[in-house]
């Protein structure tokens, strides 16, 4: 009999993952990560991810299954590894994905180490993706979920071989509707609970307001300029903008203007036409490869540049310094620094990294 820690968010997915694991005969405990206090984010919130209501829902489901349940306090780590990185990225003109950092540094690092400390064998999550072992290649593979509308392999690209060997994802072969039916059949309190949509610590979606409250300082205003450096107007501070943004610029113009570039060094935001947003080539650091050891030779892949982006044909390779390069067959709109680029070979995740450079079309 194996021993499993079920990472329970309070949602229906992790609850059904817990049920399926327990029904397999393994010894299970449920655990929810405590990531912050409400006062940390300056709001009273009960209805979004990681809230007190979520803890109570997770506890209810665990007790219903006669499964021990714990809350792991990772608040200090969450501040350092997720919130601080989120703020730093925006202040440096990037648009981060904090869910990936949470997986990288908390769920599959801190909780992974907790699993090892207590002598358990693996972690179970409610992510929609699949982990398989390939005997011929002697490596673990991360694959897309059967339900492509819910596939979350993109946010798991950072998993290492050691981690994949101790991770189980029971929902990878199920459709979301099937998961809800299972939850309803067992009378789970969260069977029809809505999926969380917001960044958990910015529930109102106002990233700039959160950053200014978190840092205790107001971001300095600066200039909007065109791609030739000509002055257009004043902006409210670079943390208010992301690549491709059109609304909220406050600039009267004869044609639509979009945020094309953010320069923290000069505190300027470059505005341009929609066509200025397209580019074909990027570089990424913080690289993790799963299906291969390296990309020393160019490899044909499909690639995503954000979670909701439809994969596009591309060629991927690494330079000797480990930097990941991706060149799309066709120009892509609004490739953004700070977002992850994830490469696929069919349904296998080849690997990915954090975008840190975009090559101009010109």
Where are these regions (language model features)?
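AMP-forming adenylation/ATP pyrophosphatase catalytic core
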Residues: 124-362
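ATP-dependent adenylation/nucleotidyltransferase module used to activate substrates
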Residues: 1-157, 168, 178
């Amino acid at each position: 009999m194996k021993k499993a820690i079920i990472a329970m968010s309070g949602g229906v997915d992790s609850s059904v993952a817990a049920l399926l694991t327990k029904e397999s005969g393994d010894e299970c405990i449920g655990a929810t990560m405590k990531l912050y206090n409400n006062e940390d984010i300056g709001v009273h919130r009960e209805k979004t991810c990681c809230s007190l209501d979520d803890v109570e829902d997770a506890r209810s489901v665990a007790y219903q299954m006669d499964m021990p349940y714990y809350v792991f306090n990772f608040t200090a780590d969450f501040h350092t590894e997720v919130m601080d990185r989120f703020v730093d990225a925006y202040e440096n003109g990037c648009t981060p994905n904090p869910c990936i950092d949470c997986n990288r540094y908390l769920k599959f690092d801190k909780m992974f180490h907790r699993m090892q400390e207590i002598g358990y064998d693996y972690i179970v999550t409610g992510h929609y993706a699949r982990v398989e072992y390939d005997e011929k290649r002697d490596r673990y593979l991360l694959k897309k979920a059967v339900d492509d509308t819910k596939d979350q392999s993109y946010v798991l690209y950072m998993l290492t071989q050691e981690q994949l060997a101790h991770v189980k994802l029971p929902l990878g072969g199920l459709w979301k509707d099937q998961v809800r039916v299972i939850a309803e059949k067992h009378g789970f309190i969260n069977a029809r609970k809505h999926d969380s949509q917001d960044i958990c610590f910015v529930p109102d979606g106002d990233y700039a307001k959160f950053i200014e409250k978190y840092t205790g300082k107001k971001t300095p205003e600066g200039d909007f300029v065109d791609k030739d450096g000509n002055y257009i107007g004043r902006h409210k501070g670079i943390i208010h903008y992301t690549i491709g943004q059109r609304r909220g610029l406050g600039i009267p113009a004869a044609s639509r203007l979009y945020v094309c570039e953010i320069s923290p060094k000069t505190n300027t935001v470059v505005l341009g036409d929609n066509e200025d947003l397209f580019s074909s080539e990027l570089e990424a650091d913080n690289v993790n490869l799963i299906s291969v050891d390296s990309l020393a030779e160019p490899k044909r892949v499909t690639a995503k540049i954000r979670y909701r982006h439809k994969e596009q044909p591309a060629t991927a390779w690494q330079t000797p310094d480990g930097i990941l390069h991706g060149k799309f067959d066709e120009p892509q709109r609004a490739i953004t620094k700070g977002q992850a680029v994830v490469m696929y070979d069919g349904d296998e995740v080849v690997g990915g990294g954090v975008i840190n450079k975009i090559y101009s079309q010109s």
